[in-house]
């Protein structure tokens, strides 16, 4: 009975609980319904208020083409309650002029895309025309309703001024992906100047007056891909100015006044692929500056103040393909400066002060296809310097630009001839053709056949030398006579050509002794009492020409010819005409010389002096006749045989070949052992 009583009590308690639940649930449901009803009413009120405000704003959200009707000033001030319903927090007067309205009296005028009524603006280019556009100017309130704006550009016009970044105006534009400010007077980019813009991908602040970047000036833009600060006056950047920019790919800092780069400045830009630091005042580079830039493809350092590139400066730039170091003051590059640049394809060292390229410099650049060393002070290029990339030069579409240096014509350049013959690409051949060098003590045997007329002029072949008393002599080369006929050539004409045409041929580099002209004239007039005509037929009969080291010998009583060399028939154009025994020789040629250098002593001036040199194209010389000097003691600078050009330049290929041979030998041994074991079992 007790058990039945207990069961009955439990049943009654459960019944009471169920009844209570049924009574409470409708009450709570009604309460929730009441709250939903009040919520809908509240929302309806807000929407009504917003709608009213929107009507009063005269298409503030949409683009417009005219100002508010009935308002001469174009401004309508709304109540602060309407503004407070937004997210700007602004509680002052509003400018209700259509966002894309354009009038001459406006401080700021925007060109919109699309520029249609009742269509949300996606892109706007705004021109500033006023010097008095302050941060609290009501003109800025026109931006508060442009929630869908994605691209915004400010261009400050002449006689206008904007010396701040309108952070308060930009911040509410949450959909903004691109912001551009050009030609402003902004001097400092302050911390978080573009904060709270989650979709921002591009910031361009070029052609402004920016001088400094504060800490966190561009921090925490996790979607930013391009930052352009070119053509400013930046000289100081905080170490953490670019903090937390994980997706940034392109950074432009060129055309500023940057002299120092903090270590780790770009450490938070791991995705950076393009970095332009050209046209600055940078004078020192360290490996820590480029720490973390393993994805960088292009590094431009053109026109800075660099004079030395140290070891492993670019060691962490594993993906670098283009390195621009032109227009600096680089005197030396360390042998290991380019170590680790396995993907480098373009190296520009044009217009520096390099006198030598270390043999091991290109050892770490096996993929290099283009190297420019124009306009330096290089005296030679050795085979061993370019051996690591020789396969590329011969077999790939490669470029080697070497013009405008101070190369010496000697045996160290012999390998250039073989490279020109073996490369498959016309562009490389053409660039090598432009290689000029200085040949000391030129001889006719140095030159290829047929010898160009300009070279003969330089060597005084077919030229003339007028001999005067007191060991005074005058030499002339090339273009010594005007016209093709020698008929009627007088002594006055000869003296005239000696004094003027020769100097023109030598481009002003040759100067006559002060007394030589008068002495020659007097001597020639005394020795010749009458004029003689030289016939064209007489000229044609004189051959071959001679190479002359002309000098005046008082003991012999006249001119002597030394070291005469006969020339080929192909040079018959160079004739000689004689005025008689002991008379000056006059040669005829219509081509100016390239370049010559001379030295003289006393009143005597000879066309070929003890030390003379010419600046000439390398490929006008015979490679086997290039002089070798005793001072070339470095074995890596000695000439190479043709066979050495066949040696593969890529050390890795040599190692792989050796490895393959070793593997083949090992496999042979293993096969032999297996065969012996099978035979023994049999």
UniProtKB/Swiss-Prot annotation:
Biased composition (Low complexity): 40-54
This protein's record includes keyword Zinc: no
Lipid-bearing positions (GPI-anchor amidated alanine): 658
Domain of life: Eukaryota
GO CC list: axonal growth cone; cell surface; neuromuscular junction; plasma membrane; side of membrane
Region (Disordered): 29-54, 503-536
Gene3D superfamilies tied to this protein: Ribonuclease Inhibitor
Membrane topology (UniProt): Lipid-anchor; GPI-anchor
SUPFAM superfamilies: L domain-like
Keywords of the record: Cell adhesion, Cell membrane, Developmental protein, Glycoprotein, GPI-anchor, Leucine-rich repeat, Lipoprotein, Membrane, Repeat, Signal
Annotated GO biological process: axonal fasciculation; homophilic cell adhesion via plasma membrane adhesion molecules; synaptic target attraction
Function comment: Cell adhesion protein involved in target recognition during neuromuscular development. Mediates homophilic cellular adhesion.
PANTHER family on file: CONNECTIN-LIKE PROTEIN (PTHR24366:SF164), IG(IMMUNOGLOBULIN) AND LRR(LEUCINE RICH REPEAT) DOMAINS (PTHR24366)
Name the record gives this protein: Connectin
